[in-house]
Regions:
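Extended, low-hydrophobicity, Ser/Thr/Pro/Gly-biased non-transmembrane segments
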Residues: 102-206
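C-terminal outer-membrane beta-barrel translocator/porin domains of Gram-negative envelope proteins
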Residues: 572, 641-647, 659, 667-820, ...
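N-terminal, polar/Ser/Thr-rich
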Residues: 1-28, 449-455, 571-575
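Hydrophobic alpha-helical and helix-loop surface patches within well-folded domains
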Residues: 229-482, 530
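Outer-membrane beta-barrel "beta-signal"
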Residues: 867, 887-900
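Beta-strand-rich binding/interaction modules
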Residues: 448-449, 462-534
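A surface-exposed beta-strand-loop module
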Residues: 54-124, 188-189, 514-525, 542
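Outer-membrane beta-barrel initiation region
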Residues: 494, 500-506, 510-513, 519-526, ...
Length: 900
């Protein structure tokens, strides 16, 4: 669906207004658009993208007043992401349509990388003016595709000509993405800049105060670096880096559509770097290393050559990764073209979590837990919505690896010709994967091109093996003959490690075993070990396309997810069971999965938990356990099912749950906020083989149906959880019910403090002899926010474990001083009102209001805020329940994982 046929001119007359005490900063003006229809079809409507109006639930950031058009028709969507203009009469081939769109766009500090951003630090202020004006949507060869235009906040448009007049206050400095042709000082104390760009995808401007501009010319490109004066050394290093980087890219890929480049500093970007045509802005400081190389490569692969599908990520990200890898190799004394995984680095990113987007998380995961830990492309198999981001990860990396392996296959010089001619052929055009594969075939052969396509899209397990090794002593040397074998249609050059009887080792690099299945090597002693692909380079490449891993490992649960193998984790268990007895044992967990909720989506297939425990305090029937299995439904995008079966004498149970997510969940790494609304439907069967002397439960089987609705939100400064549930059950024709609602809020909006609020109400209707369904009150503070079934929820105050109640109303508040390592002290007060009165819901609420059974607890606590989460709490009872725990009884909670 390559786009063509429209000649577009944007003539922007705009004015910048800085932030004041009365209003937020904004940029306003008129977008004069001139479109010539060179297609064979009539244009009956136009679609314009307004990135700032991306959210239907929030006030629009771009206000559009009366739109004027030479072919006036119905106009709609002024306050939405897509503005639609009907054309009457229709614009025929060769005709021109002129549109004037007055707009006013406000800057935001929301942290969305695609929106115009305002930020201030110390004596510096920045306004990152990107995507601030209505821009024409992409026009395909088969016409408009309005169903695609709402899929992305970032505009997806076509190349056009820009002429811009920008007026700013005199005390501001500006860097613009086009070439400035005129600069005037107005009588009003403003500066007016006139600039243009004859062929580009976007227009951007960085407007700042308190910064310094460094200008230089590199290979004919006018470069402006805008940064605080405190970063003078970093700017100098950046300039030196660009002196090598830009000529290298031009040598390898030809000239980009870039005769001007602005590199600057911004705040509230929502990511470490924002890139548009001729324009790169970094959050806080310029990253001279890999990020700059990667973002600079986007001037070739994204803004000079555009993918014809906005979702075809690999043509932008993988090519940029490959380009930055090429440059990194050129800076080494000895290039190592096939080292994909670096050792585990010592880094600390926790303070930067709130500014990390999908690309940042990809890079972080590669650094911290190795490339083996990134999700594969799911081919073939069901594609569910949550796996979309996994595809982004995998294409980001798989494409880069495939390009590197293509280079190893065809050779450096041929690969250089492939890349240079591809860039030359599609400069200023749109392209797709097949276009690149055609270029590969033109410079190599059809088999290589076909194999490259396979490397991107399918499961290609080569299954390397050594069939035989024969060592014979001749002429005072050992002659070793190594016969290899493989399966699969594509085999890359492979390293071979030979170890001899004397302990000597020889590494043969990049052996083509496809054409040379037999390797002959002379050594001083016989070979005792031969290893194909010792550093698992081929496995690294193929692993990304394998839905199922090829190995199983058993290791401790240290909290880091991985896709390298089907890992089985084990960890010791020590817990108090449902009867209050201590149990110890071991828990095994495994599956294909990565779960960093709520920072990132939860991708998983076929997860399981298997637990075996023994009760220390029970002389007989003291063993038990459970198994839990969960995976997505094959037919539903946002539904996951879970099956659990367990036994702890005298209780055995079976539970089947369906977790239904309403709408698309949000994730902090992608959208700056984690949010989901989930309905969990659970049907369970519980049987007691023997009764309890205290009449807690009776023998027999009960069946329960429970509906629980959960709303969860997490951001950098505030998080909340609201839950309500209704349980219905029956046992021997006797029905029983349970209803509850709770709300928890945690805020970090006050610098240096954590503030938490909790409230809960619960009611039980149960006429059975036992009291299994009633509320049992235990003091468990809500130390951490909910994380997919792992974090305990606050549930009131402590009481005797055998004392049961039908109605409860509880609430609490805690305040603590927050540091990077710990929250100390956490001062809290919690209370509960209970009642055993029967009746309707309104009668029970009234009885709670009259009840004199009020328990209040106060105390102090300590919480760590590191990857190892520990909470220590010491309650002091203001009104002590009968049989309750002693004052200052230590409550400790501990968990390994990501702190929320």
């Amino acid at each position: 669906m390559l786009g063509n046929g429209l000649d577009i001119l944007y003539n922007l007359d705009i004015y910048f207004h800085p932030r004041t005490n009365q209003s937020a900063g904004f940029i306003e003006g008129i977008n004069h658009v001139r479109i010539v229809n060179n297609t064979k079809d009539e244009l009956k409507q136009l679609y314009f993208h307004n990135a700032s109006n991306y959210s239907a639930s929030k006030a629009p950031l771009t206000e559009i007043s009366e739109v004027r058009c030479s072919h006036t028709g119905h106009i709609s969507g002024q306050d939405s992401l897509v503005l639609k203009i009907g054309l009457f009469p229709a614009v025929k081939q060769g005709e021109t349509v002129i549109i004037d769109i007055p707009f006013k766009t406000f800057f935001t500090s929301s942290g969305n990388p695609h929106l115009p951003a305002y930020g201030a630090r110390k004596d510096t202020t920045t306004y990152n003016a990107i995507n601030f004006y209505p821009v024409l949507e992409y026009y395909y060869t088969d016409g408009w595709h309005p169903e695609l235009y709402t899929k992305s906040i970032k505009p997806y448009t076509q190349f056009a000509q820009y002429k811009v007049d920008l007026t700013i206050p005199k005390d501001f400095m500006v860097g613009v993405s086009g070439n400035v042709i005129k600069q005037n000082e107005l009588e009003t104390g403003h500066l007016k800049y006139s600039f243009k760009d004859d062929f580009t995808l976007s227009c951007s401007a960085l407007i700042v105060q308190g910064m310094h501009k460094t200008e230089l010319n590199i290979s004919g490109v006018q470069v402006e670096i805008i940064a605080p004066k405190t970063q003078t050394k970093r700017v100098q290093k950046t300039a030196e880096h660009l002196q090598a980087l830009i000529p290298f890219y031009e040598q390898r890929f030809g000239n980009a559509l870039m005769d001007k480049l602005v590199i600057g500093i911004g705040y509230s970007l929502g990511t470490h770097a924002v890139t548009n045509g001729n324009y790169i802005i970094f959050q806080g400081h310029i990253d001279i290393e890999h990020v700059l190389d990667h973002e600079m490569a986007h001037q070739w692969f994204d803004y000079s050559i555009q993918a014809d599908e906005y979702r075809d990520v690999w043509l932008n990200e993988s090519f940029a990764e490959y380009a930055s890898w090429l440059f990194a190799q050129s800076q080494k004394d000895e290039a190592d073209p096939f080292t994909f995984t670096d050792p585990l680095p010592d880094i600390n990113i926790w303070s930067d979590i709130k500014t990390m987007d999908t690309e940042d998380w990809t890079r972080f995961l590669m650094d911290v837990i190795g490339e083996k830990s990134l999700p594969p492309v799911y081919q073939p198999g069901k594609q569910i919505n949550w796996e979309t981001v996994a595809n982004i990860y995998s294409k980001y990396i798989v494409g880069n690896h495939a390009l590197q392996n293509l280079q190893a296959t065809v050779g450096d010089s041929v690969m250089r010709n492939i890349m240079f001619n591809y860039c030359l052929l599609f400069k200023g055009k749109t392209t797709n994967t097949e276009d690149f594969i055609v270029v590969v075939e033109q410079h190599s052969e059809k088999e290589i091109a076909d194999n490259f396509r396979l490397a991107l899209t399918t499961n290609i397990s080569p299954d390397l093996e050594i069939k035989n090794v024969d060592s014979q002593f001749k002429h005072r040397q050992w002659h070793n003959q190594i016969i290899t074998s493989f399966e699969g249609s594509w085999i890359m050059p492979v390293d071979i490690l030979i170890i001899t009887e004397n302990g000597d080792s020889t590494l043969l690099k990049q052996v083509d075993i496809k054409t040379n299945k037999t390797i002959n090597l002379a050594t001083s002693s016989p070979a005792v070990s031969v290893i194909l692909d010792p550093r698992k380079k081929l496995f690294d490449d193929n692993r990304f396309n394998n839905r199922w891993p090829r190995r199983v490992s058993l290791q401790p649960d240290y909290g880091l997810p991985s896709w390298e193998t089907y890992k089985v984790y084990y960890r010791p268990k020590l817990k108090r069971d449902w009867r209050g007895n201590w149990r110890t044992g071991v828990k095994f967990s495994g599956g294909l999965g990565i779960n960093l909720m709520p920072i990132m989506p939860a991708f998983y297939q076929n997860l399981f938990d298997f637990e075996i425990t023994f009760s220390i305090g029970v002389p007989k029937h003291n063993w038990g356990g459970k198994i839990n299995y969960r995976t997505p439904l094959e037919s539903t995008a946002n539904t996951f099912w879970e099956l659990e079966k367990g036994y702890e004498y005298p209780k055995k149970w079976t539970k089947l749950s369906f977790n239904n997510y309403f709408g698309e969940p949000k994730y902090l790494a992608v959208q700056g906020e984690s949010y989901y609304s989930r309905l969990t439907s659970t049907i369970s069967s519980t049987e007691y083989i023997a009764s309890d002397s205290s009449a807690w439960w009776t023998t027999g089987q009960s069946v329960k149906l429970k509906e629980k609705w959960t709303i969860f939100s997490y951001s950098a400064t505030q998080r909340y959880l609201v839950e309500t549930h209704l349980l219905y059950g029956f046992q021997e024709e006797v029905s029983f019910y349970n209803f509850g609602i709770s709300a928890d809020v945690e805020t970090h909006k006050f610098e240096g403090f954590i503030i938490r609020l909790h409230s809960e109400a619960g009611f039980v209707w149960d006429e059975r002899a036992g009291n299994e369904l009633d509320y049992r009150l235990l003091y468990v503070p809500k130390v951490w926010q909910q994380r997919e079934g792992r974090i305990p929820l606050f549930r009131g105050v402590a009481s005797d474990e055998k004392e049961w109640h039908d109605n409860i109303l509880s609430g609490g508040v805690s305040v603590g001083f927050e540091t990077e390592a710990a929250a100390w002290p956490m001062v809290y007060i919690d209370g509960a009102i209970i009642s055993d009165k029967k009746g309707t819901l309104l009668e029970r609420i009234d009885q709670l209001n009259r009840s004199d059974k009020v328990y209040i607890s106060a105390g102090i606590g300590l919480e760590s805020q590191t990857i190892m989460e520990i909470g220590l709490y010491f309650p002091v009872w203001v009104s002590h329940p009968v049989g309750g725990e002693d004052n200052f009884t230590l409550r400790m909670l501990m968990q390994w994982g990501f702190y929320f």
